């Protein structure tokens, strides 16, 4: 097994959309190589993780198939240090593949609090662009290299092989130990992560607040990390719920500030519901009753007046305001109650 570390000064996008959700998080950019698509019969052979905060690219390579367990364990130790990872189709492939191989190879239960698997939060750029942008209509397909070309990134990619060719090269490398084959395999994996790091700028081509409301978004407060999977008006309440990913707490309460509320934090799940006022087609949350104070900066929104925040106007959901309020409610809970 080889663990290769390379210094790299690139950053993810600095756009306001990105910083809204990820500014205070330790983010990694991740890609893996395997011998095939089915984790029941194929193996993890290589993983690359760019630790954005440290400015380091990590690659963990199984030099032989029988080193898979050691390589995967080493790579997961790196990824579990992240608050969030960026992938491309990782919710459908990279993350489930590693989870299934881990269960089979390492035969261990995930630590208490690592709800749902080995990676705390996964931003899948493919899902964002596929469902919440116009690129599906503009481009012939949404393969990573196709989107890279659209974003003007073709000149920054050095490798010229496909994922399938990478597997064929690995078979040759395992038999011969060819240095040339190893370099090509590592370059392909390394370039995928470098390009995906640059591709985070594509969030500006999407309806990102709506995407995050649908796909879920991370919330970090102190040593606690959560994923808000659902947020918005539900009946006569404003509802936010999801998973506790790190340092879970157990709590049941029925008041937030001076407002009636239902708050449940149990094992790896959480839920907060507060009153939703309805007036002339508007869905409104009384911020003063919740005693949010300076915890959030919700007063900056045009539809926030005199302590009342509009989260729905007719049939239109205000996704940015909804997500911001959900983040604020979670932070207020940990500040006042936990």
Say what each PLM segment does.
Residues 1-42, 51-338:
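DEDD superfamily 3′-5′ metal-dependent exonuclease/proofreading module
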Residues 47-49:
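Short beta-strand scaffold segments in enzyme catalytic cores
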């Amino acid at each position: 097994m080889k663990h290769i570390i390379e210094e790299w000064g690139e950053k993810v996008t600095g756009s306001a959309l990105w910083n809204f959700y990820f500014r205070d998080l330790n983010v990694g950019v991740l890609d893996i190589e395997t011998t095939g698509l089915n984790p029941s019969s194929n193996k993890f052979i290589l993983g690359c993780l760019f630790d954005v905060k440290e400015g380091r690219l990590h690659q963990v390579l199984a030099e032989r198939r029988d080193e898979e367990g050691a390589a995967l364990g080493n790579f997961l130790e790196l990824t579990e240090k992240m608050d969030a990872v960026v992938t491309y189709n990782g919710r459908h492939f990279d993350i489930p593949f590693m989870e299934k191989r881990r269960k089979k190879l390492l035969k261990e239960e995930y630590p208490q609090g690592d709800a749902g698997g080995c990676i705390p939060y996964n931003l899948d750029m493919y899902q964002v662009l596929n469902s919440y942008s116009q690129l599906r209509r503009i481009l012939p397909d949404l393969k990573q290299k196709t989107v890279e070309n659209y974003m003007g990134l073709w000149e920054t990619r050095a490798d010229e092989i496909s994922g399938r060719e990478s597997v064929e090269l690995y078979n040759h490398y395992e038999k011969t130990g060819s240095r040339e084959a190893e370099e090509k395999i590592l370059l392909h994996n390394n370039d995928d992560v470098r390009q995906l790091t640059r591709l985070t700028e594509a969030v500006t081509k999407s309806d990102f607040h709506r995407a995050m409301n649908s796909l879920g978004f991370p919330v970090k407060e102190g040593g606690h990390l959560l994923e808000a999977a659902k947020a918005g008006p539900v009946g006569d309440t404003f509802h936010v719920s999801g998973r506790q990913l790190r340092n879970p707490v157990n709590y049941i309460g029925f008041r937030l500030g001076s407002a009636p509320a239902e708050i449940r934090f149990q094992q790896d799940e959480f839920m907060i519901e507060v009153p939703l006022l309805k007036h002339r087609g508007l869905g409104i949350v009384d911020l003063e009753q919740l005693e949010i104070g300076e915890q959030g900066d919700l007063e900056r929104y045009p539809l926030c007046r005199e302590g009342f925040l509009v989260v729905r106007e007719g049939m239109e959901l205000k996704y940015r305001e909804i997500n911001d309020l959900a983040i604020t409610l979670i932070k207020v809970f940990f500040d006042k109650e936990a």
